Amino acid sequence: MNILITGASRGIGECIAKNLDGTIFAIGRNEDKLKQYKNYLVCDFEKDIDKLGEYITSNNIDVVINNAGEYIYKEADKISFPEIEKLIRVNLEVPMYIISKALPYMKSQKWGRIINIGSISGVMGEAGASIYSASKSGLIGMTKAIALEVAQDNITINTINPGWVETDLGLNSVEDSEFSKDEIVDCIPQRRFVEPKEI
């Protein structure tokens, strides 16, 4: 089984890639970390989108895990247009593009699995992270729509919406926010960040 994972050089993506059986096709930005995989593509989503598309179509992908993500903590009246573009591109446009390139093969074999890593912020909204929340909410909506399109082809698509996760992205998000980690943990029913392996 050929499994494509974005954001595979760290955090949730790296943990998923290390724990799945199958042939992993790892996508990320850190070549040193990606070298642990037999098949990998160093990819900057701003510059390498055509290369990414060719990589997907040439490798007959059975399973897609859209995990790569960007986060910014800025109130709505302080965010710049380039910041908006970057988050929407990485968190919504690129997953849609990847799916569009993977679906023809999945449809041809009448089987496929797509998992998008969303966020609880896309479900509830997060003050101070409006564009992040919007991008993840869009990912959830896109997932629901595509699920209706591909159901008869025996292809499933779902979104996992974690809360705070003990990753570089999660911890950097705390540093950027106005809240301490302890204050955030007090709002989590488990009273802790989850580990990537729990996703």
Regions found by a protein language model. Name each.
Residues I188-I199:
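A conserved structural motif in NAD(P)-dependent oxidoreductases
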Residues E75-A76, E83-I88, I184:
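Substrate-binding pocket helix/loop in short-chain dehydrogenase/reductase
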Residues S9, A17:
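N-terminal Rossmann NAD(P)H-binding glycine-rich loop of SDR-like oxidoreductase domains
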Residues D77, M124-I131, Q152-D153, R191:
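Active-site loop immediately N-terminal to the catalytic Tyr-X3-Lys motif
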Residues S119:
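Residue(s) in the substrate-gating loop at a strand-loop-helix junction
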Residues P104, L148-Q152:
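Alpha-helical segment proximal to the catalytic Tyr-Lys
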Residues I99, S135, T143:
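Active-site helix of classical SDR
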